[in-house]
Curated annotation (Swiss-Prot):
GO terms for biological process: proteolysis. Its main location: secreted. Residues 800-830 are annotated as: Disordered. This is Bacillopeptidase F. Residues 31-194, 756-1433 form a propeptide. CDD domains: Peptidases_S8_BacillopeptidaseF-like. It comes from Bacillus subtilis (strain 168). PANTHER family: CELL WALL-ASSOCIATED PROTEASE, SUBTILISIN-RELATED. The keyword GTP-binding does not apply.
């Protein structure tokens, strides 16, 4: 990755990787050059002495006065020969197996020591003298590799290389562990798992528990690790440490059980966790049976610490390897009898050829120590792919392990073969993804990934084999492990064994069974009835010229409707016999592939050849016989200007682009004439290429000089893509590097390479271009090639001249051109076995029902082979779309049982139907209909009528229906014959939102060197929202200034947030192609048609489609507050973004699910007398709110940004049921809860019956009464007091005040209509006052005499009087009851007369006056004067 800002380092991800992750030193242990036998001399020239010195070592002396370097000696011991001699001698003496092993190992150590002592003595003597002078120190002699490590001055180094016994001197390079991408975190470490579920998935997957059940858990064996150390007292490891002393459990015996090459600590420890995790996978489990993390829990472990945080130096690793070969006591004496059975090596160097440790590995093998090496992991500098496997794992003598995941798929970080020795690598695979094991702190941690995690599984299974048979040799163990592995294949590696999985997944049970019970083999063919009636067809461009002494690679493309089973090439030289060779398929498959065969060692004057193509049905098609003119080898005087077809020039290799013709790019014109040979005449060369262009064979003159001269134009990525000229000496297999080319030439240049050193030899010369995974340029062009005996004065020195230095800063690890090796075509394996007539081949899984072990038949032939523990079993053959079949087999040790299967195709059924919108009933166009249980069935798509149809094999299925803008739906179906199913999808109604975490301003931009990497931002939906639809993304890119020239292509992906520690988890959508705007504006990527539903948290991801500088630069907000939501995707791994990068400028456009609106006003069951009403409520912001009155839409409005809405509508008379829905372009929500509003414009009917208007009273209270009538009556109030209403009447008792009282009766209904009645009543609580009442004195009256009765009082009173007779008068009661009126003679003056009659006789009769007013007040008063009637005085 690089940034726009030139003076800044690339992101800390790069530096993190360099410091602590997966770095492989590019110049570690450069191999010695191959020198032609004809030019070897006993005397050393100045040039040959300088060639002994590593260029990187020379550079280190420019920085330091002294440095540590390694001295490698020419003399090599032959430990294998010594071991064989020791075994032979032991057998003659009839020694026991244990004594034989001891003598064998001792002989190995002795042979190494003797060779080292003899060859090193003079140099050691010199170094010790320099030590005395202060010019050298830290001298350490090794025998496991014949070498010395010393810390000394440049002068000492230059003297050392002059010793003839010294082969070369090298820097003390650092090697790296293949660390997990999930480094140890004490806080996340896990506690013990109970024994009931204590076997880890990875241990179980390789059938280790089944091996334990047979009694093989590694007991009696010892495994070693060269790593970061081990926490010896970890509960899963403590009692398994060979130094553990049960009598003194806390004080182990560390001598010869532990060695610290880094810090010299006496007791085992692990400061980096890696070694503890690795050892746990080999042997770990707790005494109580919990935490069964190890494959060989009965084995013992020993360990060497050779790695620190910065890696392990060559000197420390040599010391470790020597100790493993024969652990040393306190005095430094080796003890081969204490050597382990297996050594695990989860470390390595870079890819390619580096043989520094090969002698060490050979020594281990000779001593019967099984050398397991992890294949290595991808990193920023090693992208993986073919040939990437690290050293020493890529040695032929190393047993390399690749990594798989829980699904037995190759881990994307696992490096691949072939090896530089053209061997399949790795040998085997084992689980290496999300591995749980022991870590320091006496706890456990899962989530560790890497081939480091895979290797210990294989080391432990090797220990199980040693327990089963301690006499097994390393070769035998390798054969058992590979032959019992479960073959694994995929689309990249369709055949087994292959350069991804090797021979497959290691299987502990089968491996042990092979030793104890032996293996049987079932083989046969899986087929389906049918005939292959079409013969194969082919294409071949004939060759007309070849050159004597060379070879002729020929290619042919063959095609067949069923299967091409073999392609053979027959040739003859002159009149000789025909020779037949089998061509290798180098690309394609059994239906159509390209095949290559190479005719070796061409002689004579004429070559004839023909092809034979065989297909599955037995057809054989033969080509014509092609005649080739054989020309003598070219030599001095040869010229080739490429204007005519260049005979004898052969192009081949990986991603080969070499072609002959007229260039339209690069130099655009030839150096002379019109035509050239170039790497793609119309564009850039391929990435990850290793392409060869070989000249005709050359015969170097026996004397004189020979120079290769040619015109060259090249534009190659600085420091990463190189052009080479290689020379293959006569009789050699390894090509020598003669010229190196890098960078860009400004025009055609003259190049010259001196071939004079190859006098008298038949040699070959190759032009080779090698590229990494990114940044391809215009390439290399060759013209006007000449072989001359005279120099043109432009000789290119090997690895020196011809290299054009790059400008600018290095952004990724440069390629070391010294390690380059030309490509060799790798054949694609395919079987050619006898076939059955009248059948067609079928790829099927063949399984052992009782154990589950399985393999696959070859797609081109139907043939399969399955090795298994001997016994009686049931084999099952099953293939997609076919009825499975079984048959009983009896597998016998070392015998082959035939079992053929002919399968019958299953019947198919048809599912059809219509998908509609659940809300509207309209058809849904573009809905996808999936068969969940059968991903091979292509999803059906609905047409514009919503109709779909799909075909699948009969059976029970779950059908999922999904469409953009809708919620998906599922249903179950029993598919048999034709089935029809209708589906209604609920629309997803959303409103737009934008999620952003940057501040909108871009301060920088980034671009990855390699395509396929990316950046992501974690998005979180708004509060209260748990679901949404992703409708688009906003991406901000830099302008055309960066990168230059740049590009616009990129991809968009979407991940959920279920990854470990918050990382992106599962990809839920994408990749989608997009085009970047490079003008400072945001680039909007429309995803609305994709139907991407997201949960609360999700990731929007930018994936770079093109390598830098042909990609856009994603902008970075470096000044805004860091959101902590930034992640980067590098080499298939997610990791948190570099905080220094700030916030990645990626935003998400989402539709939040539109909520069903809520009407807040008017309230339910409300009444109004208004014709219209304002409906208010809440809805999702920006949605259109539709208000309905009954079934009819009454109004429409848009919800505001805060979600509120309001709209006026017209009401109907009577009851109105109001609802609201919200809509977007995608559809409409459900209706809100109904609100009932009644429009009532009629007033209540009301009477006021009591009191009558104008009434008078003297009462303090009054009951007001009347009648009322209304359907929606709310209340009746009298003077504001709520009246009692019943049966159409109302009443209310009120208080009155003295004086005039107005009584108001109001009848109100629920709609607010009112009827009012009023009345007035006069109230007087005061009684009239009587004054001046006469007679004031007693009066004597006789019959006929009158008395005047008078008084004063208020006006308009009703005045009366009565004469109250004494009670003694019998008739008094009658008289007393009579009231006689008084007349108001003047306002307020009342008078009256009473005349005595003769009939009344009374003494003391009283006169009482009574006044009454209109209010009902009454006053009585008795006059002071009494009446004596008809009495005597």
């Amino acid at each position: 990755m690089r940034k726009k800002t030139k003076n800044r380092l690339i992101s800390s991800v790069l530096s993190t990787v360099v410091i602590s992750s997966l770095l492989f030193p590019g110049a570690a242990g450069a191999s010695s050059k191959v020198t032609s036998p004809s030019v070897k001399k006993e005397l050393q020239s100045a040039e040959s002495i300088q060639n002994k010195i590593s260029s990187s070592l020379k550079k280190s002396f420019k920085k330091k006065e002294k440095t540590t370097f390694l001295i490698k000696f020419k003399d090599l011991a032959n430990p294998e020969k010594a071991a064989k001699a020791a075994v032979k001698k032991a057998k003659s003496k009839k020694l026991s197996a244990a004594k034989t092993e001891y003598q064998k190992r001792s002989a190995v150590v002795s042979s190494l020591k003797v060779t080292a002592d003899e060859s090193q003595q003079d140099v050691l003597k010199y170094l010790n003298t320099q030590k005395d002078k202060g010019n050298a120190d830290q001298i350490h002699s090794y025998y496991v590799v014949n070498g010395i490590a010393v810390h000394a001055s440049k002068e000492v180094m230059e003297k050392v290389v002059q010793f003839p016994e010294v082969e070369k001197v090298l820097p003390n390079e650092k090697r790296q562990l293949f660390k997990s991408s999930s480094p140890f975190n004490m806080k996340k470490a896990q506690k013990a798992i109970k024994a009931t579920d204590g076997v880890e998935w990875n241990v179980d997957q390789i059938d280790a528990p089944k091996a334990w059940a047979l009694g093989y858990d590694g007991t009696g064996t010892v495994v070693a690790s060269i790593d970061t150390g081990v926490e010896w007292n970890h509960p899963a490891l403590k009692e398994k440490y060979r130094g553990y002393n049960p009598e003194n459990p806390n004080e182990p015996e560390n001598e010869m059980n532990w060695y610290d090459a880094v810090a010299g600590e006496a007791s085992p420890y692990d400061d980096l966790a890696h070694g503890t995790h690795v050892t746990g996978t080999m042997v770990g489990s707790e005494p109580d049976g919990t935490n069964q993390i190890g494959v060989a829990p009965g084995a013992k472990w020993i360990a060497v610490k050779a790695f620190s945080e910065d890696g392990g130096t060559d000197a420390d690793i040599l010391e470790a390897g020597e100790w493993v070969l024969a652990p040393k006591d306190a005095e430094g004496n080796p003890h081969p009898e204490m050597a382990p059975d297996v050594v695990n090596n989860s470390w390595g160097g870079g890819s390619g050829l580096d043989e520094w440790y090969r002698d060490m590995v050979n020594a281990w093998r000779a001593a019967d120590i099984f050398p397991e090496f992890s294949a290595g992991n991808t990193d920023l500098f090693i992208p993986g792919g073919p040939g990437s496997i690290a050293n020493p794992a890529n040695y032929p003598e190393s047993f390399a392990t690749g990594a798989t995941d829980i699904n037995k798929k190759l881990a994307d970080f696992s490096l691949q073969g072939p090896s530089p020795y053209d061997e399949i690598k790795p040998e085997i695979s084992a689980p290496g993804v999300n591995i749980r094991s022991s870590v320091p702190g006496q706890t456990y941690e899962d989530g560790w990934d890497g081939t480091s995690m895979a290797g210990p599984h294989v080391s432990a299974v090797a220990a199980l084999l040693k327990q089963a048979n301690a006499s097994l040799s390393v070769d035998e163990m390798e054969d058992i492990l590979t032959s019992t592995a479960e073959p694994l294949t995929d689309s990249t590696f369709p055949d087994s064994p292959n350069n991804g999985y090797g021979h497959g997944l290691v299987n502990a049970f089968d491996a042990v069974s092979a030793v104890t019970d032996g293996l049987g083999k079932a083989e046969g063919q899986v087929s389906v009835e049918g005939d292959d009636q079409e013969p194969p067809v082919y294409q071949h461009e004939k060759v007309t010229e070849a050159y004597e002494g060379g070879s002729l690679p020929l290619t042919l493309t063959a095609e067949d409707n069923v299967s091409v089973t073999s392609v053979k090439l027959s040739y003859k030289l002159d009149q000789g016999e025909w020779t037949e060779i089998t061509a290798k398929r180098i690309s394609g498959d059994h239906l159509k592939g390209t095949y290559q065969a190479e005719i070796p060692d061409i002689k004579g004057t004429k070559l004839s050849y023909k092809w034979m193509i065989h297909d599955f049905g037995g057809h054989v098609v033969s080509s014509d016989v092609y005649d080739v003119t054989v020309k003598p080898s070219i030599t001095a005087g040869y010229k080739q200007d490429f204007e005519t077809a260049p005979g004898g020039w052969v192009a081949s290799g990986t991603n080969n682009n070499w072609e002959w013709g007229v260039p339209s790019t690069g130099p655009n014109t030839a150096a002379s004439g019109e035509k050239v040979y170039g790497t793609n005449l119309t564009g850039n060369y391929a990435n990850s290429a290793n392409m060869n262009l070989v000249m005709p064979p050359i015969k170097a003159p026996d004397s004189g000089s020979l120079f290769l001269q040619f015109k060259s134009w090249h534009n190659l990525e600085d420091d990463f893509d190189y052009g080479y000229v290689f020379v293959l000496p006569e009789g050699e297999k390894n090509w020598e590097q003669a010229g190196v080319y890098n960078g860009k030439t400004s025009s055609w240049t003259d190049e010259e390479i001196d071939l004079s050193a190859y006098k008298g030899q038949n040699i070959q010369v190759m032009f080779n271009l090698q590229s990494d995974e990114s940044i391809a340029k215009e390439g290399w062009y060759i013209d006007d090639v000449v072989l001359s005996d005279k120099s043109a004065g432009k000789t290119v020195k090997k690895n020196k001249l011809g290299v054009e230095k790059p400008s600018g800063k290095q952004k990724k690890k440069p390629v070391n051109p010294k390690k380059a090796k030309p490509s060799a075509n790798t054949a694609v394996k395919h079987q050619n076995k006898a076939i059955q007539p009248q059948v067609l081949p079928l790829k099927a899984q063949v399984s052992v029902v009782e154990t589950g072990k399985s393999t696959y038949s070859d797609q081109s032939t139907g043939q399969y082979t399955l090795k298994h523990k001997a016994g009686d079993y049931t084999l099952m053959a099953e293939a997609y779309g076919y009825q499975s079949k079984t048959q009983k087999v009896s597998l016998k040790t070392d015998q082959t049982t035939q079992a053929n299967f002919t399968l019958e195709e299953m019947k198919k059924g048809t599912l059809k139907g219509t998908v509609i919108n659940k809300t509207t009933g309209e058809p849904v166009t573009g809905a996808s209909v999936y068969v969940v249980e059968d991903a091979a069935v292509e999803p059906a798509m609905t047409n514009d009528k919503g109709e779909y149809m799909l075909e699948a094999y009969e059976g029970a299925y779950t059908i999922k229906v999904a469409a953009p803008g809708y919620y998906s739906d599922e249903f179950s179906v029993e598919l048999k014959g034709d089935v029809t199913k209708e589906t209604a999808l609920k629309p997803f109604v959303g409103y737009p939102g934008e999620i952003a975490y940057d501040d909108g301003t871009a301060e920088n931009a980034n671009s990855y060197f390699a395509a396929g990497n990316g950046w992501a931002v974690k998005m979180t939906l708004a509060d209260g929202k748990d679901k949404g639809m992703l409708t688009g993304g906003l991406f901000r890119f830099w302008d055309t200034e960066f990168p230059d020239p740049g590009g616009t292509e990129f991809k968009v992906e979407v991940y959920d947030a279920t990854g470990k520690d918050g990382a992106p988890g599962k990809k839920i959508a994408g990749p989608f192609n997009a085009e970047a705007l490079r003008n400072g504006e945001w680039t909007k990527v429309d995803l609305s048609s994709k139907g991407i539903m997201v949960d609360k948290d999700f990731y929007l991801v930018y994936i770079q489609s093109k390598p830098d500088p042909y990609s856009p630069g994603l902008a970075m907000d470096e000044t805004g507050q860091n959101s902590g939501r930034n992640w980067q995707y590098i080499d298939g791994k997610w990791q948190p973004g570099d905080k220094a990068d700030g916030n990645y400028m990626i935003r998400a456009l989402v539709d939040y699910e539109a909520a069903v609106p809520e009407i807040t006003s008017p309230t339910d069951k409300s009444y109004t007398n208004k014709d219209s009403v304002t409906v208010k409520g809440n809805a999702s912001p920006g949605t259109t709110v539709h208000i309905y009155n009954g079934e009819k839409e009454a109004g429409e409005t848009k919800a505001a940004a805060d979600g509120t809405f309001h709209a006026g509508i017209i009401l109907n008379k009577g009851e109105n049921e109001l609802t609201a829905t919200a809509s977007t372009d995608n559809g409409t929500t459900d209706a809100s809860s109904p609100i009932t509003v009644t429009l009532d414009q009629e007033k209540p009917e009301l009477t006021l019956d009591n009191p009558k208007d104008g009434g008078k009273t003297n009462k303090e209270t009054l009951t007001v009464k009347g009648a009322v009538s209304d359907d929606n009556l709310k209340d009746v109030k009298v003077n504001g007091k709520k009246a009692t209403v019943a049966d159409g009447s109302y009443s209310a008792r009120i208080l009155l005040e003295n004086g005039r009282n107005e009584i108001k009766v109001i009848a109100t209904d629920l709609a607010g209509n009112k009827t009012t009645k009023k009345t007035v009543i006069d109230v007087n609580f005061d009684k009239p006052v009587i004054s001046g009442l006469i007679p004031g004195e007693d009066k004597n009256l006789k019959a006929g005499e009158s008395v005047k009765i008078a008084f004063s009082s208020a006006e308009d009173l009703d005045a009366t009087f009565t004469i109250r007779m004494p009670l003694t008068n019998a008739r008094a009661s009658v008289q007393n009851a009579t009231e006689l009126p008084l007349r108001e003679i003047s306002p307020g003056r009342y008078e009256g007369y009473w005349t005595a009659t003769s009939s009344i006789k009374a003494k003391g009769a009283k006169v009482e006056v009574i006044v009454r007013d209109d209010y009902g007040n009454e006053t009585r008063k008795t006059a002071n004067g009494k009446l004596n009637m008809n009495t005597e005085n």
